């Protein structure tokens, strides 16, 4: 702004008066006042200069601009420095990351070596495991038996964990060589599963080495387990380790590895990734692994597929473990094949069991990888070309899965089974949360989960043992699963292909092929891996889920162990091998993978076969998972691409392929499995889901996982029992938690597929939007499609379980003893698994459907869950996601509501998955919660809605809402999907309802005594306040320092409490439309508290972390709560008024209250207004909930402003309503509705009738929504920096006021929000303000006459809205009795209260106050540019109203100027800016602006020799208006205040004029609405003028001026509506209202003020009024006399002059009227500085009048001292008239014969000036305010010219600049007035005084002073040229007079003319 100000303002200055600014720079003749500073030699000039270093306005302006520019430059420099520092920090971080990557790469290298050794060991282990697998398959042939055996195997594994670990170290070295050997053998013998695995491991040497290195680092790692376990197991362990390590590395270094991966080999990055994981960078590792995977998959799609298959296999293994029951059935079918594969895989798993135990947390996810690796190994054999990479990936991934399995086994054994399940569910949710953090993590999440597992494996070496035990069990389990799950595995693996399951797999795979291929196209390498993973996950759907969850786990994206546990527990229940969480998942997966184990090779072979279809899909899946892993950078990009492309290419299928492929095959397979292996596959799916849940649980606190595990176990048992019942459902549920989401949306055919699609979408979407957001949307999408699908119920249960688990986790169940549970689960769960296949089902089975019910409740409970979760979230990684998400959400929260409504639906429509990511920012937790809710509440709906349209849109929609409501809206959203229109109004209430449900009545009763059926508003408010106290009590429990999240939780709980209270109350006694009232209340509560929760003030408080932060924050919150209560009370009053307000107060009481409020205290009025405002706001919020949710964003405010503009009538009505209320509160209370209906029938306002109220509320909401929004808590940006860019004028005013008054912005935004609600349409408000500003009588008149007119309709409400709430803050500044003299642009704020006080009618005074507030809002919007208000607030007159005569420091003035310039540039119109500038100047003057301070003399005495001061009245980019005023003390601040008021008004009036013109054009319409108020104002003006004439206006002036301002505001408002009509109408109105003037005379004080405002806003009207008054009063001569008298009486000769001028103008044209108005305005100002010659200062606004006043004052306050005054008055009038040439002429003639003579002379220069003035005036009425300014300027110019023609010219130039928008007539008039003999005399006098002010403009050429011109010289030239017309004769005369050469005079005149023209052009 500063820069702009400089450019704009400086340019404006230059353009306006180029010479002056270029004083020394421009040596050309245009340097009019170049020597002004030096030239000022007079002591007077010196004195003036003393106040302003020089009289050169331009210098001041330039100085100010320079200061502003410098400040801006300094700020920018600081910002630049900060940015540079940030760059340095980022570069430092980058270098650190690079170093880390290098280290990781090195570590990966060493890990590769270790892995090769492990591979060797693994071969041995594989052999051993193969044998064991065969044995296990035999045992697995029977489920219960298998489970027991598996559990025993697990126990064995756990027992052999240490031996395995020992072996691990031993075999590690062997493995290295083996790895090398294996690579080729595997490649050569892809059929050999061992070799395949070894080969995959070898090919994944990086992964293997990573795993090995991890294992090495964790000497206890599964390497030993692998070795000890079996050669195969060791080999598997190597692979698993490598896979796990790779996953970990990928997880930890994935992001880093993205870059490294692109530059480095997969192995190297993975080594680095492994190192990173070892270093504890699971996320990075996951990412790098994703990259590595993507690269590997890129290099070899088959390998990628194999890897993916492996991942899927491991995921599937988990699922298989869960699905063991079914899998066993299937495995019986494919037992032989699967036994072989399963043996290999089981050997891997045996290796992995120790790893899994170690990695159990991670391994739940990694197991799929391990299995997948096994699959990949097989696939690698099948696909020798790609085996190396695939094997690498496979081995590494497998290692990860193995490791993860081991860890997960341990975790599950500890009770992680339930945790595993919960983790799995959470994994789908929290994983989505974390994946939200790591957008890639949803798909890659699986891979990452495995990767996380390795990371965890590092942390959990013991899990290796458990994993080993689990693997042993898994081997047996897998044997069984091979027996039972072979078909299932065939679906997912080659063996699956053998069976119909294989067909299903192929079916899914083809789908994957479709989607994944396109995904592969998007990122072939990544897609290859993802495709492999997805394809494998197709074979291993559960595994795919597990892969995601594993991935998440690897990335620490996994949900807390609680979630994992449930999955694991379910796995243990379902699978004998499940007992160890990892082992269970793995065992299951292995069972399924038993079949999968065989299938992996088969699956991978299948993949190879289906590879043509699936390779790319697999790759896509791998790519997706890899992308997710590497998503940090690439994820967002690639995954978005994948998602988008997949969406575009594959559409739903592709999305499934992309994200769902991992899980999609599973859904298809699961569906097929339902048919074939229904129970087994479902269990498999359950296993996968549980694995995912366990992974999710991992994300959550592990203890939570434990509890979740237990819960899940219970549910599992139930689920197992119900497993068969709802196998399909369970499968879907599992898919839903894990892959179902991914497949859900895209594989709509497969219910599970859509579910999977959702998951994938979640993963994909997360990458696109935000990790958490994306993931969460995906989850929601997932839930929606799942809802659509059968999984709906099952999925719902899963989410519910997840929620329950989450709750448990949150509650501290997360203290779960993973290890203990693992051990216990290994034993107990295994046992349970055998007997409880159904209980395992709970995850997938009817128990889950029950969970669905629970989920539905959970959705209700989710709010609590959210709160508790959030409370505990800090401990969860999810929390961080949630935090970041919520931060993002914060920023977008309000927009989100809107977005929810529109964008959300749209985005959902576009890409439920993709756009969810992009369109929504959501914390994972929110997403998961939202998903749960969606699953719960939206499931039916979503199933109908989401599934049909893929429900992605609906899902996204819900996602958005979830995000917005932190997941609470998730439920809401589904509901809203169905009732989207309802969502905006109901979403919050529905949310609230859920919250209320969550917050039971009993819980509320514990907090406060509930009166469920309150009989009075007071009872309701009392309960609300008690709740507020409870909130405070909770808040005060915080320590001095607490986190933002804690605060958010407090606020969220407060929202919940309040909304719950509102929901539980039966308000039927109070209100008829209870639901509407409750909705309104809830919406207001939510919107307000959300704003409290998320706004810049709170953020800054937390950022600053001050010692008193807690106190300050609560102060803010308390204020907001008070504001909220007021708002709620208003809503209640509104709703209760129609019903039983008598319960609280009778209607009469209300009316009394209103009256009291308006009359007795601003506070009361404020309260009432606030109530009304709140009512309106509530209504508004109902209709504009979305907007409100925008948190009054600046854009929203702008939009609201636009809305207000569009709804100008509404706003007007509001204003009028406010006005009416203010004028007649009782009447308004009674007639408000009538007024509303009458004045805004089309725009019903909140009224008495609630039914009516809703519509009215909508209209009012729209109208006041803007204002309300404008005054809502300022956005962070707004609060932090007073940017008016996006800030509405009202808000600017509010901010400015707050800053100046020191009132907290929060107060303003909070309490005053309602007040200022209507202030946004300041200009429109002006109409009602004008009416309001009219004295109470006039107001009543208006009310009575135009009761139906808008003025009264909203006046009280709106005024309260506008000023009452803000009034107090305003009153804080305005409370000081503001003298009209003090009235400043800034003072206007003050004046509003002062004026209100000043007015006899407190009511009108309050009205005035709002009006002034409006004016200030406008002006402040203009002047509130930036730092200056803060800088100068101490000097601001309204801050120091009493210091009227004290001079405002120049810096303050300059600050105002810069503000104005900035403000104008930013968002203020030129008119407003001009006003602001002038106002600033006047405010400076009023507070004794620089030149006012110079003329310290309180009384203006006409001293021709006194120096004149040029005051910049207007400054803008284009131009600046300079008022040349006498420095004499006579220029009292009052003048400037009047000027300021006028200027401020002018700025408003300009719009107002337009409105007025329009009104006149549409006199009937506007007369009824606006015109009458305008007429009243005019009458008031006339009355004021008469009062001034008749009464001594001194007192009146003060009061009157304020009314004038208000009137003016009203007029301005009217004018805003009808700008063009103003002039004519004003004449008519004035004429029409002339008779009314007498009536208005009573209101004269306010009227007089109104004239000022009118002058500015409705100059014509004011002129008309004056004209009327003049006509009524006397002839021109009489008028002049009267004017003189008035000036004396009022100490406002100016006012008299103005009136005189008006009288003259009455005969004159509208321009003349404008000029007259200016005079009147000046008169008000002048009345303040009566007879103060400083009319020059007023010149800009009312300076000319002031000059006259000065003379008059000097002569005496009595008009008779006028003789000179009269001449001056004539001059002034003429000057004003000269503003409009026509009127000028008329005036001249009317005034006197002498004036015409002089007029001719003056008119010549005036004509010159008129050129510019005409240009300014050319705008016509719209510029009438400027014209007034210009006229005033001209007057002061005339006076100045009297002082000195040169000075006059200067002043004229400035005036012309100021009156750019005014017509030249003003100048002519001023000149002609000066032309009068007295004018000549005064000119002579002035000529003397200019000496002081006559800083000679030194015209230099080549450094030589040729001519020096004083301002007096310029004035003289201009005056004479105006009078005599520019001619040689005139120039000669002037040359003699000025001792110059006629040519010089002529040249000077031309220069001045050029200046004026230039300013005109500007």
UniProtKB/Swiss-Prot annotation:
GO cellular component: cytoplasm; mitochondrion; nucleus; PML body
Superkingdom of source: Eukaryota
Residues modified as Phosphoserine: 20, 560, 798, 858, 923
N6-acetyllysine: residues carrying this PTM: 1323
Pfam entry (one): Myb_DNA-binding_7
Chain spans, region NCOA2-binding: 1688-1962
Keywords on record: Acetylation, Activator, Apoptosis, Cell cycle, Cytoplasm, Mitochondrion, Nucleus, Phosphoprotein, Repressor, Transcription, Transcription regulation
Composition bias type Acidic residues, residue spans: 919-928
Membrane spanning residue stretches: none
Residue numbers of N-acetylalanine PTMs: 2
Tissue specificity note: Highly expressed in heart, brain, thymus, lung, testis and spleen.
Composition skew (Basic and acidic residues), residue ranges: 164-184, 252-298, 308-342, 348-426, 456-512, 524-533, 604-615, 888-901, 929-938, 962-996, 1246-1255, 1785-1801, 1831-1841, 1849-1865
InterPro entries assigned: FLASH, Gon4l/CASP8AP2_myb-like
UniProt motif SUMO interaction motif 1 (SIM): location: 1716-1720
Main location: cytoplasm
Protein task: Participates in TNF-alpha-induced blockade of glucocorticoid receptor (GR) transactivation at the nuclear receptor coactivator level, upstream and independently of NF-kappa-B. Suppresses both NCOA2- and NCOA3-induced enhancement of GR transactivation. Required for histone gene transcription and progression through S phase. Required for histone gene transcription and S phase progression. Involved in TNF-alpha-induced activation of NF-kappa-B via a TRAF2-dependent pathway. Acts as a downstream mediator for CASP8-induced activation of NF-kappa-B.
Family matches, as PANTHER family: CASP8-ASSOCIATED PROTEIN 2, CASPASE 8 ASSOCIATED PROTEIN 2
Name of the molecule in the record: CASP8-associated protein 2
Annotated organism of origin: Mus musculus
Gene name tied to this protein: Casp8ap2
